[in-house]
Amino acid sequence: MGARSSVLRGKKVDELEKIRLRPGGKKKYRLKHIVWAANELGKFGLAESLLESKEGCQKIITVLDPLVPTGSENLKSLFNTVCVIWCLHAEEKVKDTEGAKQIVQRHLVAETGTADKMPSTSRPAAPPSGRGGNYPVQQIAGNYSHVPLSPRTLNAWVKLVEEKKFGAEVVPGFQALSEGCTPYDINQMLNCVGDHQAAMQIIREIINEEAADWDVQHPIPGPLPAGQLREPRGSDIAGTTSTVEEQIQWMFRAQNPIPVGNIYRRWIQIGLQKCVRMYNPTNILDVKQGPKEPFQSYVDRFYKSLRAEQTDPAVKNWMTQTLLVQNANPDCKLVLKGLGMNPTLEEMLTACQGIGGPGQKARLMAEALKEALAPAPIPFAAAQQRRTIKCWNCGKDGHSARQCRAPRRQGCWKCGKSGHVMANCPERQAGFLGIGPWGKKPRNFPVTRVPQGLTPTAPPADPAADLLEKYLQQGRKQKEQKMRPYKEVTEDLLHLEQGETPHKEATEDLLHLNSLFGKDQ
């Protein structure tokens, strides 16, 4: 391999394999990257032996630096690899490629006092922390200079407006693309919009109103001494009566800096918000979930309309907690109410997942078919009678006596004796009214049957009743005798005269008073 194998040795190879290609990435440098860099140096007329020392790597960086801004991806990768090798020769601790480029940059600035030899993508920016190298205002050699916006940024802004048509996404998109811009750059972005001139006119009117308010709140002080920077007016902030140099001086002066770029951005954001309300007239109260709409689509529409609402965050929070559940369809609302108080959005989406989709439709269809094909329910009383039916002929359950195949049982079905039927069975239970002639047994107050061999506690029969019955029989007999015809009576008297006594007892009864009174008289 020649010089390639002597570029890094021992601990330097181990340190190389710990450096990441990108910040936070998983891939790390390997020896194959050194071999590739050595092969690429030949394309630029540079010797591979330059990679073996720190000074040689610095010469390579000096040659490649002017070509990096307009170079290809291979050229940029070669420059990054050489920076990493330079840090390894200088025994600098680095974690990734970006860290190596920053260390090389600081070293060259300390040696030469200028950053002109470094690529524009790695030069430090003047604004505070968090601002990258693409900012329009950059600090080069201690001086602030303006770099125009790239065509890519302007194209992204125009494409955003054309696709979203002043939707709720336009405001945050403008904030991201205009970060750190001067009023001059912001006016360039607005002038690139060809369509939607009505919205542009609304933004211009808002800018004029805000500029007038600025002039009222910040009156002009007295006459300024010669050479002193004047204070910005409303038209200066809008970029119509000020130059780019004045705007940069107002933004980055040491005493009392005025961020004219951020102020102008805030005015335009107010105008964009009015355009969003004009192009999206849908009210958040009118956003309701359809009967067959998935809950996730409804939530997306809800938050899109909520994003366009320019209200207080507390009001938006109340809308989220109240209207999101209130405007859902009945199926989702029933599920959401079962989640308790103040459920999270993740819990709502998980609980309502599948509602309104094909899966739920299939389940509802299956339940409907199941109910339609199910047999008619049997009333409880009828079911009880069917379960407790019993045959009185054989005593078995499951059929009636009419359907019984056993021989017909004779006599009473209750006691088994002949001469009566079950309705007149003397052994049946007596109710409160006793066993009457009616065919139904009383159901109230059942009385237990008295066992045989026990003497009942009822009093004996009254003898006066027997005596009265006897008197009644005698009275009937005497009445029958009185009603005998006269011929029979004369025949009896004739027989007496002839000495015959065929009816002696009857004659004596007629001749004595016994016919009227009993023997006790």
UniProtKB/Swiss-Prot annotation:
It comes from the Viruses. Residues 14-33 are annotated as: Interaction with membrane phosphatidylinositol 4,5-bisphosphate and RNA. Residues 219-226 are annotated as: PPIA/CYPA-binding loop. SMART domains: ZnF_C2HC. A motif (PTAP/PSAP motif) lies at residues 456-459. Residues 111-137 are annotated as: Disordered. Residues 7-31 are annotated as: Interaction with Gp41. A lipid is attached at residue 2 (N-myristoyl glycine). Belongs to the primate lentivirus group gag polyprotein family. This is Gag polyprotein. The gene is gag.
